[in-house]
Regions:
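Active-site donor-nucleotide binding/catalytic segment of nucleotide-sugar enzymes
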Residues: 26, 30-33, 176, 180-248
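Donor-binding and catalytic core of enzymes assembling or modifying cell-surface/extracellular glycoconjugates
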Residues: 95, 217-301
Length: 337
């Protein structure tokens, strides 16, 4: 795969021609990854493309079924081209989806992640006039925090590429992550939340204690945090734990808990809470994408790439921040918002 993409990279290294923004009608965005967080992280790019190319429709090449729900309120997102979640169990379908990339013509095909071989290959397979593979040329190794973040890098990348086609960079702020919840969804989320919490008259602090692999904090760690959280805020706030589909609670279900199979309903409930606290995971990014101030907990060195991204959120390095200091951060955010 790497050898093939190396050849393709050389073939499409310097696209030539003219791009007139109002004439761009169809764009393909390639992010063949099925994780919730990774698909949410492309929402700022989709918004950027919609502003830059006002007459375009956007197709997405992804993995799994999540994108259909995440982007259902994006009016200019059209086709969701989905790789099956388990390709070896659906090999024929998997191959067929790859070949379907040749079915439609695009003005622009964009790969999101530079080191994704499947993303680069999918962009190059298309019948597209311009194929952008995600590189920032001399800025690929830049250490600037803004460029490291996976919600921001694709936007900076496309801005730099388009500047080479004399499309001006307006230097506007990069949009927040957003699943565009409707007013009806938000109202239903409020109704669901009020049916769960102990006192609907109080605002709610929401926690999510699960994460995959090494990102998941121990029960001992979470129980210490919950004890301090409960001591500091139980009188003034409800505390709600949103559960994963595995029905696992790192605080042994000591707080009222709730789960939904509907990812948009889950987002709508979180949107009606005061603050959201979670380790690095897809649901953390979901909280950011519904504009709830989010405290993201990190113990690895990828904090600059995957910190919760919205106005009011913060990433905490738990290697240097203990439970007491975490409560101080939460206190600051509660008063700020």
């Amino acid at each position: 795969m790497k050898g093939l993409t190396y050849y393709i990279d050389r073939l499409y290294a310097n696209p030539k021609g003219t791009i007139i923004p109002n004439d761009v009608k169809r764009i393909l965005v390639c992010r063949p990854n099925g994780r919730l967080g990774n698909q949410l992280l492309i929402t700022p790019l989709i918004q950027e493309l919609s502003e830059t190319f006002p007459n375009c429709t956007i197709d997405l090449f992804v993995k799994g079924n999540l994108a259909s729900f995440l982007f259902e309120n994006y009016n200019n997102v059209d086709r969701i081209i989905r790789l099956p979640g388990k390709p070896f169990k659906e090999l024929g379908k998997y191959i067929g989806v790859w070949w379907s990339l040749r079915k439609y013509k695009y003005d622009i095909a964009i790969n999101i992640v530079p080191n994704s071989s499947s993303g680069r290959l999918s962009a190059c397979l298309t019948r597209s006039r311009f194929k952008f593979l995600g590189d920032l040329e001399d800025e690929r190794s830049v250490s600037h925090t803004e460029l490291q973040h996976m919600a921001k890098f694709p936007v900076y990348s496309i801005r730099k590429i388009l500047s080479q086609f004399s499309i001006p960079n307006k230097e506007r702020p990069i949009q927040e992550m957003d699943i565009k919840l409707s007013q009806a969804e938000l109202a239903n989320g409020k109704k669901v939340l009020e049916s769960i919490v102990t006192n609907p008259e109080k605002e709610t602090i929401c926690i999510y204690t699960f994460a995959t692999g090494g990102k998941c904090y121990s029960k001992t760690w979470w129980e210490e945090v919950y004890k301090k959280l409960n001591s500091a805020y139980a009188e003034k706030y409800n505390i709600l734990e949103v559960l994963p589909k595995e029905n696992i609670s790192q605080i042994n279900f000591k707080a009222p808990s709730w789960y939904s199979l509907d990812i948009r309903e889950m987002g709508a409930v979180i949107a009606n809470t005061k603050i959201f606290i979670s380790a690095d995971c897809g649901v953390m990014h979901l909280a950011s994408a519904v504009h709830t101030p989010t405290v993201g907990l990190f113990s690895s060195n990828n904090i600059n790439r995957y910190a919760p991204y919205n106005n009011g959120s913060i990433a905490i390095n738990t290697n240097t921040t203990g439970a007491a200091e975490l409560i101080e951060v939460i206190e600051h955010l509660l008063h700020k918002h």
